[in-house]
Amino acid sequence: MSMSTTTEVIAHYWAFAVFLIGALGLCSLMLLGARYLGGRAQARAKHVPYESGLDSVGSARLRMSAKFYLVAMFFVIFDVEALFLYAWAVSVREVGWLGFIEAAVFIAILLAGLFYLVRIGALNWTPVRSRRETAGKSHVRLTSGKHPQQ
């Protein structure tokens, strides 16, 4: 490496080196300041997680219903849909009618998937037994002895 090339490299990267040294120095200063200036609690409750003022009872390892995971997956799917539609909305003038048709087909496919999920009961939170029990009942309440349509 010649002298002019080394000087050019140093001139090119000096700002990054100053930034890196400053960032590491600031992090070290904050960590050391917290170590020497912070309080030290030696109580038994120091290692117990905070539970909104309530004492912890039982194990934190609880079995979760699979429906929570389904809702999370649905959220991710429709969040990605929103991301694609946002990208389309930003470029709507450049893509023209062809882009509009593609977006409409995309939305139609997603709506068909949503209707399918509703039809198979993937979004239904009640147990199958209680759905069967309420299927035969009328949702009309009688306030008097007469039927509401009489």
Swiss-Prot record:
Keywords annotated in UniProt: Cell inner membrane, Cell membrane, Membrane, NAD, Quinone, Translocase, Transmembrane, Transmembrane helix, Transport, Ubiquinone
Residues passing through the membrane, by range: 14-34, 70-90, 98-118
Reaction equation(s) it catalyzes: a quinone + NADH + 5 H(+)(in) = a quinol + NAD(+) + 4 H(+)(out)
Subcellular location: Cell inner membrane
Disulfide partners: none
Keyword ATP-binding: no
Enzyme class: translocase
Major localization listed first in the record, in broad terms: membrane
One cellular-component annotation, GO: plasma membrane
Membrane topology per record: Multi-pass membrane protein
Example of a GO MF term: quinone binding
EC number in record: 7.1.1.-
Alphabetical list of InterPro entries matching this protein: NAD(P)H_OxRDtase_bac/plastid, NADH_UbQ/plastoQ_OxRdtase_su3, NDAH_ubi_oxred_su3_sf
Function: NDH-1 shuttles electrons from NADH, via FMN and iron-sulfur (Fe-S) centers, to quinones in the respiratory chain. The immediate electron acceptor for the enzyme in this species is believed to be ubiquinone. Couples the redox reaction to proton translocation (for every two electrons transferred, four hydrogen ions are translocated across the cytoplasmic membrane), and thus conserves the redox energy in a proton gradient.
Recorded family membership: Belongs to the complex I subunit 3 family.
HAMAP family for the chain: NDH1_NuoA
Quaternary structure, from the entry: NDH-1 is composed of 13 different subunits. Subunits NuoA, H, J, K, L, M, N constitute the membrane sector of the complex.
Name used for this protein in its record: NADH-quinone oxidoreductase subunit A
The species this protein was found in: Proteus mirabilis (strain HI4320)
